[in-house]
Amino acid sequence: MSTPFGLDLGNNNSVLAVARNRGIDVVVNEVSNRSTPSLVGFGPRNRYLGESGKTKQTSNVKNTVENLKRIIGLKFKDPEFDIENKFFTSKLVQLKNGKVGVEVEFGGKTHVFSATQLTAMFIDKVKHTVQEETKSSITDVCLAVPVWYSEEQRYNIADAARIAGLNPVRIVNDVTAAAVSYGVFKNDLPGPEEKPRIIGLVDIGHSTYTCSIMAFRKGEMKVLGTAYDKHFGGRDFDRAITEHFADQFKDKYKIDIRKNPKAYNRILIAAEKLKKVLSANTTAPFSVESVMDDIDVSSQLSREELEELVEPLLKRVTYPITNALAQAKLTVNDIDFVEIIGGTTRIPVLKKSISDVFGKPLSSTLNQDEAVAKGAAFICAIHSPTLRVRPFKFEDIDPYSVSYTWDKQVDDEDRLEVFPANSSYPSTKLITLHRTGDFSMKAVYTHPSKLPKGTSTTIAKWSFTGVKVPKDQDFIPVKVKLRCDPSGLHIIENAYTTEDITVQEPVPLPEDAPEDAEPQFKEVTKTIKKDVLGMTAKTFALNPVELNDLIEKENELRNQDKLVAETEDRKNALEEYIYTLRAKLDDEYSDFASDAEKEKLKNMLATTENWLYGDGDDSTKAKYIAKYEELASLGNIIRGRYLAKEEEKRQALRANQETSKMNDIAEKLAEQRRARAASDDSDDNNDENMDLD
């Protein structure tokens, strides 16, 4: 049975959660952290995913890819490319399909990977983290993504999950997942017939700022309005600090970290830590050793100075809140509580700015780092056929209006806005078209100007075949079932022709009609389904051939990583065996090997050690195993003698202990017999004395 898995794919760190044991648990990674760095690194032989990638990032900046969620679906000529490019230390390149790829050095060769591939690598990593921690299979996942993700980006992230061997049961907006956490675990919500509780939920993470206005009742939640600033997050604060020190160090130390990616990245990492320290302290020191040209740098920053540096950002705090309220047709006076999540909301001046806009104190009912992942895990559990979860109904809204267009075959409209902006989903609509033959349809965004820059206006295309128009008619009605599914994807479920038929329906008899009255009928025209049309869809999803090809490539890379890890384990085991066996030959094994055996084994150890640090430094798993077994063939004989002697000693000790124990028991029994005998003699003497009397 698959364990429901919720993934909050963060831009800086990701959080993993599962539904189990009648609750939702956050999964810790291999170093017991409750979040995992969202990055992929590439080395001479293998990949560095998550924690290992973060560890090697400073020395491997050009081959470490961060900001994965920002380049999903991003086109190389997108107006926002330059904004994103400045946050990358790796080289971004243009793929054949016009999207952004990343060029890295891997295994001694230059490789280019798509954003979908890179994201799949990371998802595969965290999938195995969850499997190892839960000791269960993981097949279903609910992925939390930014609200501004377009249809194309949602398809791309779903493909990444499939490449990683997962079934994406739902793509959910991250603030919606957090709201599900709130609604499911909050016990004091209004009842079904009561006025709903209105919550303003503000999420500011590493790269995005989102505000959502939501209505809660017990067992249900509805999103009323959502707005965002997709270029406002913790990384912008980090960069402001880094740029400040870049200018300062240029004057103070005559170095320009902007010309040295490794140095800039080290200052950026230190700036992130400084930002966190200033959330709890009014001032903090700043220092980085040997940042470049063997120069150590040091400085300090106060909270007041930080607030001055980020003043341009703080001026943008108001917009997402006021826009979300406008969508919801509410004012700040209608808001009952303001909940904040996301690591960046810990910055004091930012919290104050949010509170000032709402005119209310802020609440931290939700875990700021884990609420999204827990909500996603609960949503995944809802889709599980084997788990029973607490009933909870929720509706999200699509910020973009979507229309459907079709071939104009009769004198009729050829376009219809089906899902207006901010309409709730999931939702299904049925439309009727008059068709003269086979036709095609498209789903498009109604107002391209309201989309994020660079977003494709076309969502999907469909071709329909099998339209048969009766000879006595000019056209035939076709019913088309349109749907915005739970993941916010606009699809067509089916299409079919209809025809009108005449049927006889009974007419109800008067109440005073005799029992043997003849039943009356009337002719009624009914519309029935006639022919289901053939349908071919063209979406942003990978086709089966492309998907299988990428799955095979990921499997190859995973197996390669596994082989490298196992090879390193065998190498370390061989090295440890050499040191351990050499030490024991002069110690506990000394009396159990002849001089000839010692000399032979020591020579073997020396030869193997020289090989290990020479030609064998980069050898194969099989070779390390063979070398280990070669040493063990003699070492185990000596070890066996030692263990046999130790066992003999243990047996002798155990026998002595048993003998001593039996002697103690015998002595105690003898003592008891002597005591009873003495007691009997005393009684006999007393009897004799009584006779004399």
Swiss-Prot record:
UniProt keyword Metal-binding, yes or no: no
Per the record, the similarity remark reads:
Belongs to the heat shock protein 70 family.
- Origin species, per record, is Saccharomyces cerevisiae (strain ATCC 204508 / S288c)
Function field: Has a calcium-dependent calmodulin-binding activity.
Name the keywords, alphabetized: ATP-binding, Calmodulin-binding, Nucleotide-binding, Stress response
Give the taxonomic lineage as stored in the record: Eukaryota, Fungi, Dikarya, Ascomycota, Saccharomycotina
Q: What else is known?
A: Present with 6300 molecules/cell in log phase SD medium.
InterPro entries per UniProt:
ATPase_NBD, Heat_shock_70_CS, HSP70_C_sf, HSP70_peptide-bd_sf, Hsp_70_fam
The chain's coiled-coil residues are none
- Biased composition (Basic and acidic residues) is annotated at 664-679
Which superkingdom heads the taxonomic lineage of this protein's source?
A: Eukaryota
Q: Name one Pfam family in it.
A: HSP70
Q: Give me the Gene Ontology terms describing cellular component.
A: cytoplasm; cytosol; nucleus
Q: Name one GO molecular function term.
A: adenyl-nucleotide exchange factor activity
Residue numbers spanned by region Disordered: 653-693
Q: Which cysteines are joined by disulfide bonds?
A: none
Quote the gene name from the UniProt entry: SSE2
UniProt feature, compositional bias: Acidic residues: 680-693
Asked if the record carries the keyword ATP-binding, the reply is: yes
Question: What does its record list under induction?
Answer: By upshift to 37 degrees Celsius.
UniProt name for this protein: Heat shock protein homolog SSE2
**GO annotations under biological process?**
proteasomal ubiquitin-independent protein catabolic process; proteasome-mediated ubiquitin-dependent protein catabolic process; protein folding; protein refolding
